[in-house]
UniProtKB/Swiss-Prot annotation:
It catalyses: CMP + ATP = CDP + ADP; dCMP + ATP = dCDP + ADP. This is Cytidylate kinase. One of its GO terms (biological process) is pyrimidine nucleotide metabolic process. Signal peptide: none annotated. The gene is cmk.
Length: 220
C-alpha cells in the first residue's frame, strides 16, 4: 500500500491549490475527485439524463463510463472533458447528481481503483470518510464564506470566465447546503482528520503545515 493523503473540505477552501502543490513537492500522484464528478455529470447531461431520470437509464449510462485522470485533466471514454467542467453550472450539476447513491458508488469505486497501491494526494468532499478511510493522513480544509467567494471569483477570472460575485456566492451556498445535507456521505471531517482553517493563512503557510504532518506520519 502506498502513502495516501486525503484532503477534504467545502468548495473553494483551497483543496486543489494545496493538493497540487503537495503532490509536486512530495513527488506523489494527484487526483481531484471533484473533477471526476463534474465530468460524469456533464457526460450524463449530454446523454439527455438528469438526476430525476429513471434509475435503470442512469445505471445503463454509468456502465459505459470509463474515467481517467491524468496530469490534471479528466477524460470520459477517452474524451477530454476538462474544459467542459469549469463553469459554475457544472459544479451545481455535479452536486445534484452526487445525491444519487448509484452515481457516488460508481465513482467511489473508480476513485479507489485509481488510488490503489499509489503514493497519492486525493482531494474532494468525502475522501477521508468514504473513499480512503484508511489514508495515512487526513486533512480537512475550511475557510470563511467570504474568503471562499474571493478565491472562487479569482479562479473563474483566471480562466477567462465572466462570472459575477453574486453568482459565485449563490453557487457556494448551494453547494454547501447540498454537501452538508445529503443523506449519502455528507460533508464532514473524518474523526481522525486534522482540521485547518485557511481563512487568514497563505498558501505556503498551509503547505508547510501539511508537509510537517506528512513528515511526522511517515516517521511513525
Amino acid at each position: 500500500m502506498g502513502f495516501q493523503i486525503a484532503i477534504d473540505g467545502p468548495a473553494a477552501s483551497g483543496k486543489s491549490t494545496i493538493a497540487k502543490l503537495l503532490a509536486e513537492r512530495l513527488g506523489f500522484e494527484h487526483l481531484n475527485t471533484g473533477a471526476t464528478y463534474r465530468a460524469v455529470a456533464v457526460y450524463l447531461k449530454e446523454k439527455g439524463l438528469n438526476p430525476s431520470s429513471p434509475r435503470e437509464e442512469l445505471e445503463k449510462a454509468l456502465k459505459d463510463v470509463k474515467v481517467d485522470y491524468r496530469d490534471g485533466r479528466v477524460f470520459i471514454n477517452g474524451k477530454d472533458y476538462t474544459e467542459k467542467i469549469q463553469s459554475p453550472e457544472a459544479g451545481i450539476l455535479a452536486s445534484d447528481f452526487a445525491k444519487l447513491d448509484l452515481v457516488r458508488e460508481h465513482l467511489v469505486r473508480i476513485q479507489r481503483e485509481i488510488c490503489d497501491d499509489k503514493n497519492i494526494v486525493v482531494e474532494g468532499r468525502d475522501i477521508g470518510t468514504v473513499v480512503l478511510p484508511d489514508a495515512q493522513l487526513k486533512i480537512f480544509l475550511t475557510a470563511s464564506l467570504e474568503a471562499r467567494i474571493e478565491r472562487k471569483l479569482r479562479e473563474y477570472q483566471k480562466k477567462g470566465l465572466n462570472v459575477s460575485r453574486e453568482e459565485v456566492e449563490r453557487e457556494l451556498i448551494s453547494r454547501d447546503t447540498q454537501d452538508s445535507s445529503r443523506k449519502i456521505a455528507p460533508l464532514k471531517p473524518a474523526e481522525d482528520a486534522v482540521v485547518i482553517d485557511t481563512t487568514s493563512m497563505s498558501v505556503n503557510e498551509v503547505l508547510q503545515k501539511i508537509l510537517k504532518l506528512v513528515e511526522e506520519r511517515m516517521k511513525a
